[in-house]
């Protein structure tokens, strides 16, 4: 049990680290990166709130992990109710933030795609996060499934941070995102196999499909059907 608690604590810390590194230039260490993108009011205020809500989620799962590690299960469950509220905030601000970014003049700042095309990416990240965290809440009395769904849901939320980790220039962002996502799922699968003799169903049927979905997003986004939906959604803000 101690090894298991240490493992999941390390996995959460890895996700926290990716968020801090990815968003350091535009959020956490904004003053140290004068060339980073800026937003005009009221967008700036919204994205500050969005960043705070996402940061609160990351801090919460770290605290929750430490509570379980310290066997403070009762407090962990009480804090879980507040975590539900924060999770809703993450999903809602994620979707609205994507619509806001896509509807501005010039569309999304970095991706070289029309706004209605790229919109699918953050919309799916927020949707997967909501579904997986919802599944974790449903499975809260099944600890092994619960903790894996929390991790994988948070991994989905972290996609925007991972793509911003660009050690070899902007073009390396998607490669880093895919590599880190696959590495995370593989490490989880190896842990499952070594400790239980099999890959946990959540890891197998949620983790790997989550990674593979990355390769289906742009083929779907390039269809006329999605682009029509994307244009309709962007007109809402």
State the predicted function of each range:
Residues 1-237:
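Alpha-helical membrane insertion/targeting regions
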């Amino acid at each position: 049990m101690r090894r298991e608690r240490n493992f999941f604590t390390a996995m959460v810390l890895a996700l926290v680290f990716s968020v801090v590194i990815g968003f350091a230039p535009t959020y956490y260490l904004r003053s140290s990166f004068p060339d980073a993108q800026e937003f005009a009011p009221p967008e700036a205020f919204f994205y500050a709130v969005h960043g705070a809500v996402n940061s609160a989620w990351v801090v919460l799962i770290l605290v929750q992990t430490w509570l379980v590690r310290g066997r403070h299960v009762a407090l962990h469950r009480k804090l879980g109710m507040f975590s539900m509220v924060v999770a809703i905030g993450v999903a809602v601000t994620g979707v609205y933030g994507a619509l806001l970014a896509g509807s501005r003049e010039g569309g999304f700042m970095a991706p070289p795609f029309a706004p209605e095309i790229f919109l699918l990416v953050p919309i799916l990240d927020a949707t997967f996060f909501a579904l997986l965290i919802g599944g974790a809440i449903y499975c809260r009395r099944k600890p092994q499934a619960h903790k894996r769904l929390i991790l994988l849901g948070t991994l989905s939320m972290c996609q925007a941070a991972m793509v911003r980790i660009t050690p070899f220039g902007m073009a390396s962002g998607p490669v880093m995102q895919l590599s880190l996502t696959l590495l995370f799922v593989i490490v989880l699968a190896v842990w499952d196999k070594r400790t239980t003799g099999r890959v946990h169903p959540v890891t197998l049927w949620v983790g790997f499909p989550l990674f593979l979905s990355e390769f289906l997003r742009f083929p779907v986004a390039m269809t006329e059907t999605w682009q029509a939906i994307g244009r309709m959604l962007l007109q809402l803000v």
